[in-house]
């Protein structure tokens, strides 16, 4: 789907660029269809696929008690890559850009200061991001007492948010490179917000306003 969207976008741009030229309809169509030389390989949908696929494999093959250690390893390892590879600079010397150009080719990257926001290396912390979500989901399924569930979820959210902002003094919160602190803070805020929704809807019973959002909640990838 992601590659299809990227191709369609390139098709439209090529079609529009040929609108003023005196060529036949079939020639214009052919040149617009065969635009794979500059198609962007990675994107949001592709990242979702990579992260969900990696998380599924890890969840099926690794003992779940070791997943938190893997999350820490992925985030720390990625931070070391950023520090040693000029990863916080928006230029061609950035390790993220270097790897993407070497593997994907510059013609197949998102053109934004040499950095592809959905590049290969930045998928590492994104996988850790999804793994944190897996751990939170596992907690929600295993803990039956709703009060204990809320306490643990609020605690996790608070700790992650505080830790992320604290670490941001040495590792800036940056979505474009998907910095470790960005993953930690967003997971913390998301966990806290989820706990708040559970408290409002399941504990207090204010459910009528949430009916509209149920379809989005149970079908997020389809939407």
Locations of the language-model features?
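Alpha-helical transmembrane segments and their immediate juxtamembrane cytosolic regions
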Residues: 1-223
